[in-house]
Amino acid sequence: MAKKVAVLAVNPVNGCGLFQYLEAFFENGISYKVFAVSDTKEIKTNSGISLTADDVIANLKGHEDEFDALVFSCGDAVPVFQQNADKPYNVDLMQVIKTFGDKGKIMIGHCA
């Protein structure tokens, strides 16, 4: 059975970590979809490179059953999370992580 992974990318994201995940999934035939933890699909890496994610985290809510695992790709947005915790996309982030956890799904991530 094919596996499918939801990849969360904060804004800004650690591009090195994100691309290591994506390359590993690609090379191993694992399907994935990248969700920006943002109001828009357009995000940046810590070094300022612009990226376009597949979708935004708000659209992952309610679709957790379509994925076997959740991968969290950290970045410079995390150290200032407390200042932005009330933003809708960060509220969605916490809800999605909780839902994946409640369903006993695999969750991994990194912070660098």
Residues covered by each model-derived region:
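Catalytic nucleophile serine of serine hydrolases
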Residues: 109-112
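Active-site cofactor/cluster-binding pocket
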Residues: 106
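Extended, subdomain-level signal for the structured scaffold at the beginning of enzyme domains
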Residues: 1-103
